[in-house]
Amino acid sequence: MFGYVVANIEDATDEEKARYHAAYCGLCRTLGRRCGQRCRLALNYDMTFLVLLLESLYEPPTITSKARCMAHPLTQHDYTCSETTDYAADVTVALAYHKCLDDWNDDRSVAARVGAAALSSAYRRVRTRLPRQCGAIERELAAIGQLERARREGAADEAANAFGHLMAELFVREEDLWSNTLRAVGFHLGRFIYLMDAVCDLKRDAKRGSYNPLAGLECLPQDMEVALSVIAGNAVAEFEKLPLEQDLHLLRNVLYSGIWQKYNAQFKADEKEGAASAAESVEEAASAAESTGENAGENTNAAESTRETRA
């Protein structure tokens, strides 16, 4: 389920692109230093969003430097690291380890089994550091696995809720004033990721005869767009409650546009038109959530700002 919570690079400024890649490179270096070089293979942009979000909220001391690496041996690249990067590296390892286990259990993939074995010692260390978060991963993935093995129709919402609860715990590094809001952002974003993954895989799973939680609903992938927009709107409404300044436009880029890129690429004839439509749908859903008092965001004009930047 990696690859959904990413920035729409086409709509980012040069400064934002540099910041995004510096955070990504910092996460890569931290994975190698903290968890072992093989763990750098688990690197993904989804956790870069978590780094940017928590750094914007808590503003920890940050190290900024340049370095070469195996991927870029000839040119030095900027990177940034903080205690938030350490946390995101641990979460990355935990998710990657359990993804390998899941792939092995589902497909008997030899590569997944090798990956799980390679990450096992690092995961044991991470579990010692993050018992609450790793416990949530184990508990909620077990619940999802049970639902998927039962192949019961109508279980998509239950499974999405379970993944939402998983993500909710990962968004909270420590309990404080903002824990409930961060959990709410993670919960709605987790629901979105699970259902978006099911939508994008629906046709492929049907061809393979693989289980898909949406298979029994007899709906086209495009029929899920409204539901996905509502869920994304809920995540946005909670996100806008956070007192963020640093990287705010870049974070909004991810939530208003970036999370729709795979959907737009697969189901929209014109991806740019689709991205604008999706952002408008998310804005409407966030406004609706605020007006009903369910998710009263404090900055519901974020999508307008994002669209003005596009223009």
Name these PLM-found stretches:
Residues 277, 281, 287, 291, ...:
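Ser/Thr/Pro-rich low-complexity tandem-repeat tracts
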Residues 1-184, 191, 195-227, 237-250, ...:
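Acidic catalytic motifs of isoprenoid enzymes
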